[in-house]
């Protein structure tokens, strides 16, 4: 009798869980079309996955061979790879003495992966070697070489790479030093800061307001946002860091609290950016002109941008306490399309929706990879076609 009751109880619980996935069909009108999105666990569920609390995706990049590399933040940071031929996420191990990797992962022309860590601020080098033939590394450390700290006493906030020159550029935190690392020689050079002071009067923002990402133009110059919302340029030829006379778009008076959360350089040479206040802008490096393209979403923050094979720019954003939303922008006619919440609903098996997005990048075939940054996180795959 007791056994029957337990079985009945299990059935009721299972039925209840399935019922939660059985949403009203009208809900599908406000989410990303379900034939264009999918989700991946960070490993082989239910056992060989990056642990909860350590799996917030905060950095993504595409290697020259098309593989996706990503890093997480949390109690520990992990490195992972996704080979599009296989389609699954392979954990490569945790990064020693690291709790955060934020837009600080790049891949060299030779395929080596470089990671900027926080809080220690070390540069790590990972050299891939027949990864798909290696066992999953969830509880083991990632096999990396420690190249030492970039800026003494600072964490690394962002990295960008000039593959042809073999130079990695970075931004430190909390004191916003811009530095460069030459791969061939191992030489690190500090070029100064993009912010000297934190903004006054904002209780929620106590640190310096600097961009969370770096952008390279087609000439190899590097851009960041800094104090009072001004853009900064590192001139590759002159090897100097200067403040440009252009500020980020936003509400007048909020310039000190504005920063770039995401950058995207297009093949035309134009650079698009999304700000902490949720504005999309276009920057022409040659003309030194910033165009305010408005707010695609009512919410704050644009946390990811990627270029589609159809020429449209896709983005994600939203407040951390609300569901993340996806949009597209057509540079040809200047129109926006709100694509909906980032949600994967596979009735009746499971449903998963994202609140906070930590990174976004497009693969060579046009697939958009979107990293969730929560206590329990997934990697989303969006297909624009």
Residue ranges, per PLM feature:
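Beta-strand-rich domains and repeat architectures in extracellular enzymes and scaffolds
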Residues: 47-77
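Surface loop/turn motifs at the tips and blade-to-blade linkers of beta-strand repeat domains
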Residues: 48-53, 93-97, 146-152, 192-196, ...
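Conserved beta-propeller blade signature
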Residues: 68-70, 112-115, 167-170, 221-224, ...
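Blade-level signature of beta-propeller repeat domains, shared across WD40, Kelch, NHL, RCC1
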Residues: 354-385
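Residue-level detector of Asp-centered blade-edge/turn motifs that repeat once per structural unit
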Residues: 62-65, 107-110, 161-165, 216-219, ...
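A short helix->beta-strand "capping" segment at the edge of beta-propeller domains
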Residues: 30-54
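Repeated scaffold domains used in trafficking and secretory/extracellular systems
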Residues: 55-59, 99-105, 153-160, 208-213, ...
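Short loop/turn segments immediately following the C-termini of beta-strands
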Residues: 73-74, 118-119, 173, 227, ...
């Amino acid at each position: 009798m007791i056994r029957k009751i337990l079985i009945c109880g299990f059935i009721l619980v299972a039925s209840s869980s399935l019922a939660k996935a059985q949403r009203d069909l009208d809900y599908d009108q406000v989410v990303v079309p379900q034939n264009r999105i999918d989700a991946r666990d960070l490993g082989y569920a239910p056992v060989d996955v990056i642990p909860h609390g350590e799996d917030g995706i905060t950095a993504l990049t595409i290697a020259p061979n098309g593989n996706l590399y990503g890093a997480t933040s949390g109690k520990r940071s992990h490195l992972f790879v996704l080979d599009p031929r296989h389609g699954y996420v392979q954990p490569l191990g945790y990064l020693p003495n690291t709790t955060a990797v934020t837009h600080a992962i790049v891949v060299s022309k030779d395929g080596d992966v470089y990671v900027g860590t926080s809080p220690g601020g070390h540069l790590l080098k990972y050299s891939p070697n027949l990864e798909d033939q290696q066992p999953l590394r969830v509880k083991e450390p990632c096999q990396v070489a420690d190249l030492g700290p970039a800026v003494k006493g600072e964490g690394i906030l962002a990295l960008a790479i000039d593959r042809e020159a073999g130079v990695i550029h970075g931004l430190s935190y909390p004191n916003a030093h811009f530095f460069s690392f030459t791969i061939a020689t191992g030489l690190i050079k500090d070029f100064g800061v993009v912010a000297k002071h934190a903004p006054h009067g904002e209780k929620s923002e106590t640190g310096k307001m600097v961009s969370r990402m770096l952008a390279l133009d087609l000439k190899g110059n590097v851009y960041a946002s800094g104090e009072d919302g001004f853009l900064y340029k590192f001139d590759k030829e002159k090897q100097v860091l200067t403040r440009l006379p252009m500020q980020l778009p936003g509400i007048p008076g909020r310039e000190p609290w504005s920063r770039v959360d995401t950058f995207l350089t297009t093949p035309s040479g134009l650079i698009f950016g999304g700000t902490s206040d949720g504005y999309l802008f276009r920057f022409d490096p040659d003309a030194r002109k910033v165009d305010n393209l408005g707010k695609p979403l009512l919410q704050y923050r644009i946390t990811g941008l990627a270029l589609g094979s159809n020429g449209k720019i896709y983005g994600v954003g939203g407040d951390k306490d609300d569901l993340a939303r996806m949009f597209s922008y057509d540079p040809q006619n200047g129109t926006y399309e709100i694509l909906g919440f980032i949600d994967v609903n596979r009735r009746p098996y499971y449903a998963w929706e994202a609140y906070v997005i930590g990174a976004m990048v497009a693969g060579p075939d046009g697939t958009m990879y979107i990293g969730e940054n929560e206590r329990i996180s997934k990697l989303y795959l969006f297909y624009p076609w």
